[in-house]
Amino acid sequence: MARFWVCVAGAGFFLAFLILHSRFCGSPVLRNFTFAVSWRTEKILYRLDVGWPKYPEYFTGTTFCVTVDSVNGLVYIGQRGDNIPKILVFTEDGYFLRAWNYTVDTPHGIFAASTLYEQSVWITDVGSGFFGHTVKKYSSFGDLVQVLGTPGKKGTGLNPLQFDNPAELYVEDTGDIYIVDGDGGLNNRLIKLSQDFMILWLHGENGTGPAKFNIPHSVTLDSAGRVWVADRGNKRIQVFDKDTGEWLGAWNNCFTEEGPSSVRFTPDGKYLIVAQLNLSRLSFVTAPPVGSIGECSVISTIQLADQVLPHLLEVDRKTGAVYVAEIGAKQVQKYVPLNSYVPSFGS
């Protein structure tokens, strides 16, 4: 009996030695064990708000996009399906308010551009019907205000401006608009428009080089005046100067398994949140300061269940809450920060 306990103790000490040796000396010995020991610790930044929304039965289609009007505390959701409302409106507390369906064919991206003076909702429509291949501005109640593109007709033209499966947009408080045009369409381009819809600069062409794209799927801005584009097909994020359009660099090292499908910054500007569709994963990447973007560094992840498929996400610029449109789970989920944010910039 004594010999048995001596053997147990010896085995325990030997296992402890292997673990410490692997930790401090980089030994590959543990790789052959049937269990995995991870020495990487991640910051836990967010938790799921299991009570949002209050009544999920209002999700009657496939939820592709979500945006937040942080001025008025409203959440807009775009869903697809036959004979259903395409746009749902909830409060940030999760209560359903209303729905509308006017002149919306197939929503892909959505953005709430709200100031103290105007509240509007922009939608990229990739439908093949009369309302498709457009970027449209609505009032908060669904009244059509502005149409960019040639409704129902895809194209590459700039005068008049045409789109082919415009994926998403970002609207600055100044009114300037950034559009990623090419969710599998002809264009693969990033366009900046002035508030009166004149083209200020653009980058576009299918390819793998700098300022070329393969499915530019999401776009956002940071407080340093940089434009960040999820170049999904090329498995990278490209960065540009918002004023000149100059290419500033790319992150290639963090997305080798799956390209990024959505990008948004936390309100304090510390982290870029990246959704990866087919991995069903959200990653929190350290945001670089002014200057070189360097290499990306993931400091936290949220691994969702298989086939949840997070498509596009949005961040409430006041509270820091993250809303994720999941096309696999056909729902939008809300994640809240463990620590309160102090609003700093409109991302």
UniProtKB/Swiss-Prot annotation:
The lineage of its organism: Eukaryota, Metazoa, Chordata, Craniata, Vertebrata. Its main location: secreted. It comes from the Eukaryota. GO terms for cellular component: extracellular region. It comes from Pongo abelii. Disulfide bonds: none annotated. It is found in: Secreted. The gene is NHLRC3. This is NHL repeat-containing protein 3. InterPro entries: 6-blade_b-propeller_TolB-like, NHL_repeat. Pfam families: NHL. Glycans are attached at residues 32, 101, 206, 278. Residues 1-25 form the signal peptide. Keywords: Glycoprotein, Repeat, Secreted, Signal. SUPFAM superfamilies: NHL repeat (SSF101898). NHL repeats lie at residues 47-93, 150-196, 200-243, 294-338.
